[in-house]
Amino acid sequence: MSTKNPSEMPRILVLHGPNLNLLGTREPQHYGADTLDAINARLVARAAASGVACDTFQSNAEYRLIERIHDARTDGTGFIVINPAAFTHTSVALRDALAAVDLPFVEVHLSNVYKREPFRHHSYFSDLAVGVICGLGARGYDHALEHALDTLTAS
């Protein structure tokens, strides 16, 4: 565990979009049995073990996610992991917020969106993301976090 002052640590922001607060109970055949709290606790602990702060935030409201992305410009965030959930296919505003802050990010989806309904095949974020992880369940967040840690600790 790092002994750095948390305000001096590099920061990763993990954003969760709409309905992800229901993880563990909502359509487990698509999204798995892990709760959002369990996922967040695992990510925060893993980041801390590498001397990196990890903030997590979930909202069902698009504007709250946008405001949190805007805050990342000035709060020391160096990397974003985002699961935009249903906003993946609809939100130009979230895309514009990510483009405006100009921070590297990985897009995560619990399910394989390409094995689901055709409307889920389009993402407004993928072309801006440094990477996209889908279909690996909650472990997709772990892989995204490892990439973020590698990126932040290499610089």
UniProtKB/Swiss-Prot annotation:
EC number(s) reported in the record: 4.2.1.10
Protein's UniProt keywords contain Lyase: yes
Site note Transition state stabilizer, residues: R26
GO molecular function: 3-dehydroquinate dehydratase activity
Pathway stated in the Swiss-Prot or TrEMBL entry: Metabolic intermediate biosynthesis; chorismate biosynthesis; chorismate from D-erythrose 4-phosphate and phosphoenolpyruvate: step 3/7
Enzyme active site: Y31, H109
Pfam family for this entry, one: DHquinase_II
Keyword terms of this UniProt record: Amino-acid biosynthesis, Aromatic amino acid biosynthesis, Lyase
Domain of life: Bacteria
Enzyme class: lyase
One of the GO BP terms on file: aromatic amino acid family biosynthetic process
Function in brief: Catalyzes a trans-dehydration via an enolate intermediate.
HAMAP family xrefs: AroQ (MF_00169)
Family: Belongs to the type-II 3-dehydroquinase family.
Subunit structure, as described in the record: Homododecamer.
Record protein name field: 3-dehydroquinate dehydratase
